[in-house]
């Protein structure tokens, strides 16, 4: 029988046996092998403790097996949790009772933090509207600019990012169409832009999981799959709409075919729960933004902060001037009283109040999200996590496997209809994607269903319009609905067409390696690039074609070369099989990463090695019966003897 020591690359020397006063025969076993303890393993530079299914610590080093990918491939749970579970002694009934009580205590705390998380999103939206609501109204007011489809798309993105609410942006568009200030055909690109702008919220939420690279990679991929779907859909459907008027004609036929009657407002299911808390912080009069957008300058100097409210909550509230200081007053047949929120008597301008609320809501959002992730990480581990992962990510049995994704879309649409906000739903599932509970392949159809769910809310809201405005309002809501349906038909039915998943995974890997790339992505995709396109579109369509055509051709060439380099490099010339002929900064983010690292005074990515420790540690092959892999370490290292 081959001893353990003979299988090591460098033979281990057994220490001399200390003969004590023992009676009876002494048995000499095989040569001792060194297995580092978890404490010693953490002191080895460049290694990371990882648990295989046998829960034995193994050092994954520079031998071509990235730690994050290997951990996700073998075990979805963090190695630290698995090691803690292995080292935890068996508990009695008292410890079991204490653990159960702690679990029951965490559940109401999780519900509380989730409630505060949703409320912080509502306050965040109000903060953005205070800071940039009137600017958004001014942007909508220039009809000559909105007649350009590309400019209309950019306006939709910027306005939705400014007010952090696609519902507010859509209501402004519906009001402008209803009043005759904007044609339906000109409003369709703005609807597309608002669909892109609303996806910025869950991308911001994903930034809160930047502490762990593996979680951040999954969370950012799960958040940006929404962005990728919206951008790809716009790249196909916007030129199609500009050339043929596809959405305008289809929705016009639907409106003309049905005898549509006005209905009730969309149900406020989530707001009924959150408004008692958010109304104590701030209350806004959003009609000011709509009035500015429709050309009514009488409310130009009015504040968005609501001062006077109706006593009857069913009636619409009317905003009064801040100069009134009475506790109650009569307006027509309605008795009004002063609103009850923190900023009701403030003398600060709207911008200052908006910045205060922006900072406070971001702090509350980050705190709630971090605590939620920690509690989910403690609850969803071991067998519980495996069961939940299996239930959520498992497909239906054959031959109905293909139905699973569409069923997830129905679930996403229903949940979004209940909470009345796609941002809230997608922001809620983003931490679960980061923890690995929901796979990105399952998060993708849930997000598509969320897109559909938010359009059904807009349709119900359009049905509440007056009869003379019903037709145009309903047509705009249907344009939003058919835009998302068309995008699903383009990018979901066939597995080969699900490009948003592959694009999101590539973005996730990039941000896990360079975490500053996530902030750069947000600034470029939702602010700098739309602003640049908007500025070029102001110069006319000739400037758009002159700048956009060469840039589009260059982008298409780079994408084509990248695909050929990864799949069939032999078809390319030798000098084009890699991008090494270009300067390093043109095909790699490492120079920029080095610059940003030094500019922010961050520590270097590589840890200094001790001269007493080896540069590399390699795994050794073990017989199948051995429960714990071993490392070839020098004899002077502290190790646990087996």
UniProtKB/Swiss-Prot annotation:
<comment type="subunit">
    <text>Interacts via its C-terminal region with NHERF4. Interacts with NHERF1. Interacts with TMEM174; regulates SLC34A1 internalization by PTH and FGF23.</text>
</comment>
<feature type="transmembrane region" description="Helical; Name=M7">
    <location>
        <begin position="517"/>
        <end position="537"/>
    </location>
</feature>
<dbReference type="GO" id="GO:0016036">
    <property type="term" value="P:cellular response to phosphate starvation"/>
</dbReference>
<comment type="similarity">
    <text>Belongs to the SLC34A transporter family.</text>
</comment>
<feature type="topological domain" description="Cytoplasmic">
    <location>
        <begin position="491"/>
        <end position="516"/>
    </location>
</feature>
<feature type="topological domain" description="Cytoplasmic">
    <location>
        <begin position="374"/>
        <end position="415"/>
    </location>
</feature>
<feature type="modified residue" description="Phosphoserine">
    <location>
        <position position="37"/>
    </location>
</feature>
<keyword id="KW-1003">Cell membrane</keyword>
<feature type="modified residue" description="Phosphoserine">
    <location>
        <position position="610"/>
    </location>
</feature>
<feature type="topological domain" description="Cytoplasmic">
    <location>
        <begin position="1"/>
        <end position="106"/>
    </location>
</feature>
<feature type="topological domain" description="Extracellular">
    <location>
        <begin position="440"/>
        <end position="469"/>
    </location>
</feature>
<feature type="transmembrane region" description="Helical; Name=M8">
    <location>
        <begin position="543"/>
        <end position="564"/>
    </location>
</feature>
<dbReference type="GO" id="GO:0006817">
    <property type="term" value="P:phosphate ion transport"/>
</dbReference>
<dbReference type="GO" id="GO:0030643">
    <property type="term" value="P:intracellular phosphate ion homeostasis"/>
</dbReference>
<feature type="glycosylation site" description="N-linked (GlcNAc...) asparagine">
    <location>
        <position position="326"/>
    </location>
</feature>
<keyword id="KW-0739">Sodium transport</keyword>
<keyword id="KW-0813">Transport</keyword>
<keyword id="KW-1133">Transmembrane helix</keyword>
<feature type="topological domain" description="Extracellular">
    <location>
        <begin position="129"/>
        <end position="148"/>
    </location>
</feature>
<dbReference type="GO" id="GO:0016324">
    <property type="term" value="C:apical plasma membrane"/>
</dbReference>
<feature type="disulfide bond">
    <location>
        <begin position="228"/>
        <end position="525"/>
    </location>
</feature>
<keyword id="KW-0597">Phosphoprotein</keyword>
<comment type="function">
    <text>Involved in actively transporting phosphate into cells via Na(+) cotransport in the renal brush border membrane. The cotransport has a Na(+):Pi stoichiometry of 3:1 and is electrogenic.</text>
</comment>
<dbReference type="GO" id="GO:0055062">
    <property type="term" value="P:phosphate ion homeostasis"/>
</dbReference>
<dbReference type="GO" id="GO:0005903">
    <property type="term" value="C:brush border"/>
</dbReference>
<feature type="transmembrane region" description="Helical; Name=M3">
    <location>
        <begin position="169"/>
        <end position="188"/>
    </location>
</feature>
<feature type="transmembrane region" description="Helical; Name=M1">
    <location>
        <begin position="107"/>
        <end position="128"/>
    </location>
</feature>
<feature type="topological domain" description="Extracellular">
    <location>
        <begin position="538"/>
        <end position="542"/>
    </location>
</feature>
<keyword id="KW-0812">Transmembrane</keyword>
<dbReference type="InterPro" id="IPR003841">
    <property type="entry name" value="Na/Pi_transpt"/>
</dbReference>
<protein>
    <recommendedName>
        <fullName>Sodium-dependent phosphate transport protein 2A</fullName>
    </recommendedName>
</protein>
<feature type="transmembrane region" description="Helical; Name=M5">
    <location>
        <begin position="416"/>
        <end position="439"/>
    </location>
</feature>
<feature type="modified residue" description="Phosphoserine">
    <location>
        <position position="628"/>
    </location>
</feature>
<feature type="glycosylation site" description="N-linked (GlcNAc...) asparagine">
    <location>
        <position position="301"/>
    </location>
</feature>
<dbReference type="Pfam" id="PF02690">
    <property type="entry name" value="Na_Pi_cotrans"/>
</dbReference>
<feature type="topological domain" description="Cytoplasmic">
    <location>
        <begin position="565"/>
        <end position="642"/>
    </location>
</feature>
<feature type="transmembrane region" description="Helical; Name=M6">
    <location>
        <begin position="470"/>
        <end position="490"/>
    </location>
</feature>
<feature type="disulfide bond">
    <location>
        <begin position="309"/>
        <end position="339"/>
    </location>
</feature>
<feature type="transmembrane region" description="Helical; Name=M4">
    <location>
        <begin position="351"/>
        <end position="373"/>
    </location>
</feature>
<dbReference type="GO" id="GO:0031982">
    <property type="term" value="C:vesicle"/>
</dbReference>
<feature type="modified residue" description="Phosphothreonine">
    <location>
        <position position="626"/>
    </location>
</feature>
<keyword id="KW-0915">Sodium</keyword>
């Amino acid at each position: 029988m081959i001893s353990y020591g003979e299988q090591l690359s460098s033979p281990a020397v057994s220490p001399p046996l200390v003969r004590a006063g023992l009676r009876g025969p002494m048995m000499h076993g095989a040569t001792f092998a060194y297995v580092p303890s978890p404490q010693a393993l953490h002191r080895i530079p460049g290694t990371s403790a990882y648990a295989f299914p046998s829960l034995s610590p193994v050092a994954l080093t520079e031998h071509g097996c990235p730690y994050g990918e290997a951990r996700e491939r073998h075990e979805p749970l963090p190695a630290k949790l698995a090691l803690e579970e292995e080292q935890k002694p068996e508990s009695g009934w008292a410890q079991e009772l204490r653990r159960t009580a702690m679990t029951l205590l965490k559940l109401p705390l999780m519900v509380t933090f989730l409630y505060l998380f949703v409320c912080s999103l509502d306050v965040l939206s109000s903060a953005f509207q205070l800071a940039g609501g009137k600017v958004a109204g001014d942007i909508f007011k220039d009809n000559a600019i909105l007649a350009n489809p590309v400019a209309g798309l950019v306006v939709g993105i910027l306005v939705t990012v400014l007010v952090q609410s696609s519902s507010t942006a859509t209501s402004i568009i519906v009001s402008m169409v209803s009043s005759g200030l904007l044609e339906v055909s000109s409003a369709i690109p703005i609807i597309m832009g608002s669909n892109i702008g609303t996806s910025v919220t869950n991308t911001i939420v994903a930034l809160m999981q930047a502490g762990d690279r593996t979680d951040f990679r999954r969370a950012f991929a799960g958040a940006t799959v929404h962005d990728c779907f919206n951008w790809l859909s716009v790249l196909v459907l916007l030129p199609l709409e500009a050339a043929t008027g596809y959405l305008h004609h289809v929705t016009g036929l639907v409106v003309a075919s049905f005898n549509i009657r006005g209905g009730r407002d969309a149900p406020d299911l989530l707001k009924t729960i959150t408004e008692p808390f958010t109304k104590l912080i701030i209350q806004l009069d959003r009609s000011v933004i709509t009035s500015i957008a429709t050309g009514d300058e009488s409310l130009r100097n009015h504040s968005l902060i609501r001062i006077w409210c109706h006593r009857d909550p069913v009636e619409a509230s009317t905003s009064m001037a801040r100069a009134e200081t009475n506790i109650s007053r009569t307006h027509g047949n309605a008795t009004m009283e002063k609103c009850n929120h923190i900023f009701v008597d403030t003398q600060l301008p709207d911008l200052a109040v908006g910045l205060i609320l922006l900072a406070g809501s971001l702090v509350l959002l980050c705190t709630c999200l971090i605590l939620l992730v920690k509690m989910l990480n403690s609850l969803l581990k071991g067998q519980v996590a495996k069961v939940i992962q299996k239930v959520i990510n498992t497909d239906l049995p054959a031959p109905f496997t293909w139905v699973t994704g569409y069923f997830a879309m129905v679930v996403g649409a229903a949940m979004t209809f209940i909470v009345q906000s796609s941002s809230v739903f997608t922001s809620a599932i983003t931490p679960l994607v980061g923890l690995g509970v929901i796979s990105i392949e399952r998060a993708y159809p849930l997000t598509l269903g969320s897109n559909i769910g938010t359009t059904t809310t807009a349709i119900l809201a359009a049905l509440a319009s007056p009869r003379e405005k019903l037709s145009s309002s309903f047509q705009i809501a249907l344009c939003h609905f058919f835009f998302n349906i068309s995008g699903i038909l383009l990018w979901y039915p066939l597995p080969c067409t699900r490009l948003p998943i592959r694009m999101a995974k590539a973005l996730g890997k990039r941000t896990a390696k360079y975490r500053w790339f996530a902030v750069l992505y947000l600034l470029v995709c939702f602010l700098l690039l739309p602003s640049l396109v908007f500025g070029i579109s102001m110069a006319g369509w000739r400037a758009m074609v002159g700048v956009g055509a060469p840039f589009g051709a260059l982008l298409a060439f780079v994408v084509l070369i990248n695909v050929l380099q990864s799949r069939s490099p032999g078809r390319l010339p030798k000098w084009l099989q890699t991008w090494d002929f270009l300067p390093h900064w043109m095909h790699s983010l490492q120079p920029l990463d080095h610059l940003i690292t030094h500019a922010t005074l961050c520590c270097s990515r590589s840890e200094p090695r001790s001269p007493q420790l080896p540069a590399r540690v390699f795994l050794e092959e073990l017989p199948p019966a051995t429960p714990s892999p071993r490392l070839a370490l020098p004899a002077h290292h502290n190790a646990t003897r087996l």
